[in-house]
């Protein structure tokens, strides 16, 4: 897996072909969910990518449509991609236990709504929108799902589905605001694609396995996402081992007994899959980013030690004060 992913990263994603644009930075974290096989969470920074809130939404939508799709390819025109999408990119209509982890019908929000075109839905404004507007929106969207379910075997397109409940695309966009509590990208999607996960055609053809590619609207959520995966599952274990070490010291155990106690605690509280065990034993990287940091031990104190942010701020404040005095 590690070899395949790195070749995919280097020879496809970072290649001159630029399947999702020119990548200027990246971060990834390998995860082993439920003691199973590895999968990778990645973030890519694309050169000159439009930023939400700084440009018109239409520019962002054009960017999204260029690189992201949830279309089921025509079997006659592109059988290879069609077969891959149908084999690895269809969410189960029965849903799995993982879907219901957070007490919802599907935490991945499948089925996804059909739409004639991609748009960015921004939450409704309580100061401008009434409760009656919200109730009407929820009623119409509920009717939409009923119609989709009733005619799922008839291969109708979005316009035909909308027509059956007297709904226009712009009205759908307006009503959709009432069921979202954050900025959301709604992709262009036909009724037969409501269980299709989004993908990039070039990446999917090369990787030949499930992916979930998204444009980031919320930078803060993105930062939280990065931090959570950098330290995922390791913080709790670290606290446990520290507690075990403290207990050993309080019991006046020698070094050998302390190591044995810590090792036993690790083995009894850390469940790992065979794949993760191999990753760790062989020294394969669980996370990596494009920005490399190398510590060079120079100066009077060559110890490698992180400096707290508050100390750095004090140093900066001290330097600023000295500059003012010298002026």
Language model feature labels by segment:
Residues 1-40, 44-327:
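Intrinsic low-complexity, intrinsically disordered terminal tails and linker regions enriched
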